[in-house]
């Protein structure tokens, strides 16, 4: 198991788990430092003691063989595996030469000792200095915080305000030092992958120069040496890119820390001071607390961030009520009382600030709720996978393949931003019919067209390969064998929504054509993976862990380009049955409430007129809406999509919680005809390949009419599983346990329509269950 990533957002929480993860990194650095010292010592002995050369080589080889690399993340790339295995390979080479006596290597000190000393002094020692600064700032901040918490509320407001300002300044400084320390630790851990191994490789190369006896051994070693050199260079290149991304994320975190906090399973978490009664008075003990609104469970762990602080035993409280503590009833500020179900006494807690207290009371449904004003950070792009979107991509591809397929640095060279935006505005103009096959004029440069294509893909509401399957694609790229990777990615591609898969097919066919001309344009499959990986598989939140997975995103794109014909022309075997999938989804959906990001976006404004209700047709919530203008085509395409959905792997972690993102444009076979080869277009004459079925989460009886072949839903009752506050006039606000009348699908995917207290409105589908 590798080292856990250190998230910048954890610096602001400063939780016990964060300190433990940080300690594991520090321990690893100490081990590395100690090992480098031993390695240098052994190297000097090797140079100085010609008579004891055999013994020194055995010891040196033994040291190399015992050390194991630990990389950040839960999986390693082929390059990292190669680098991690390199020490064992070096030890094997030295073991074969241990009986041979040779002359001392004159340049061993320059190629081996000096770089390792430089790395240890400049990198590991620098990390230790930053650690000292971090520990010192922790002491200062915690001390000042304790002093601040002991201020009496009876003091003058001016003094209290001044103390608050000083504490805020100290807190910000502490956060900055913490962020810098985390960045430095990450940098040293990454640097050791190449600055540590590269001197060893150079040392061995020097040995081969002087080893006439080891000529054959050196020839056998040359293949691995080449592979390792490439892996080191690839790792170095990735480090440069990763470092800039991490530094950029750190800057964003400094500017707006609250907007980049990591998603948490807890409703609220942070530090609270808990009043504990003693024989002689009371004391306030610092605890790290977490609270889950659904289970009303609060955990408290005594912990102090000061150096040497130990994590206490976890205590669980089943919440009964939360009441704000009156200011005049206690000397401390920011206090509130928590009453537990199984506790005879009331817990008095002190928050770190007034705002913090309001957040805790809101989370625990106290008497002073503060509605969360945080907005969904996911920006909504104007690009869609509709007729216009397919037309734009096809026109760009046609222009590129016609005029610029052999241009060097294709897709690498970026166009002028203003020109790119201008071209996109022209192509996305709704006044221009998407069916018009007008070519992009030759006045537009190829780099502008390629940048426009990439920009349009980035403007989509979600990545082309979807947030839902993003982790699954990354997991597939981490498979050990290439065959397993191809098979898993093949299955995932056929689980994508229909339009996403069609657009991906169109794009990958083009990229394969670009790669076929790599001798002229220098864009190999690997280069194209670097360009399109972060775009097609961009993560839902920007974290250090996501940045570390960029290398696997590139691998996914490389595999699809190299095997695009097999990926899209054949259907993988998926033996999962419908009933298994239904049970798996129901269990996973019932396990926890949907998060904010899982709540569907409102597209239509609901009209409550009886005329519209009579005309409304049911829309299956597990598939895209299909136009009924062409009955055979719509049934065929819907059945194909549902057949793929029914064969999903129920064990996939991405399906544990049904996530409803912004819906794609309505799927109309007439709109997408001509976008792709005829093999991808649904046949208007072929009969349906599967029966019409209801969504697993909301099975409803259907009946057919003479005017429409789509099923008509019968209104039913439904019960709310979780509370929800309306964000639009067309939505309903409700609490857990509320029963709705006349519930049926709405025109918006992911939403139901129901009646509560005489008012009809929209209800998130994954918030309710049918009775």
UniProtKB/Swiss-Prot annotation:
Residue ranges of the SH3 domain? 713-771
Q: Which InterPro entries match?
A: AH/BAR_dom_sf (IPR027267), BAR_dom (IPR004148), GRAF_BAR (IPR035483), GRAF_fam (IPR047234), GRAF_SH3 (IPR035481), PH-like_dom_sf (IPR011993), PH_domain (IPR001849), PH_GRAF (IPR047225)
Query: Would you kindly state one Gene Ontology biological process term found in this protein's UniProt entry?
Result: signal transduction
Give me the stretches of Low complexity compositional bias. 618-637, 673-683, 691-712
Q: Where is this region: Disordered?
A: 575-712
**Where does the BAR domain start and stop, copy by copy?**
7-262
> Which keywords accompany this UniProt record?
Cell junction, Cytoplasm, Cytoskeleton, Endosome, GTPase activation, Membrane, SH3 domain
Q: Name one Pfam family in it.
A: SH3_9
Ranges of Polar residues composition bias in the record:
638-650, 662-671
Q: Where in the cell is it found?
A: Cell junction, Focal adhesion; Cytoplasm, Cytoskeleton; Endosome membrane
**Iron in keyword set:** no
Q: Which residues form the signal peptide?
A: none
Q: Which Gene3D superfamilies match?
A: Arfaptin homology (AH) domain/BAR domain (1.20.1270.60), Pleckstrin-homology domain (PH domain)/Phosphotyrosine-binding domain (PTB) (2.30.29.30), Rho GTPase activation protein (1.10.555.10), SH3 Domains (2.30.30.40)
Boundaries of each PH domain copy?
265-369
Site entry: Arginine finger: 412
Skewed-composition ranges (Basic and acidic residues): 608-617
Q: Which GO terms describe its molecular function?
A: GTPase activator activity
What Gene Ontology cellular-component terms does the record carry?
cytoskeleton; cytosol; endosome membrane; focal adhesion
Domain Rho-GAP: from-to ranges: 383-568
What is the stated purpose of this protein? Answer: GTPase-activating protein for rhoa and cdc42. May be involved in the regulation of neosynthesized protein export through a Rab-endososomal dependent export route.
Provide the protein name. Rho GTPase-activating protein 26
In which organism is this protein found?
Xenopus laevis
Gene name as annotated: arhgap26
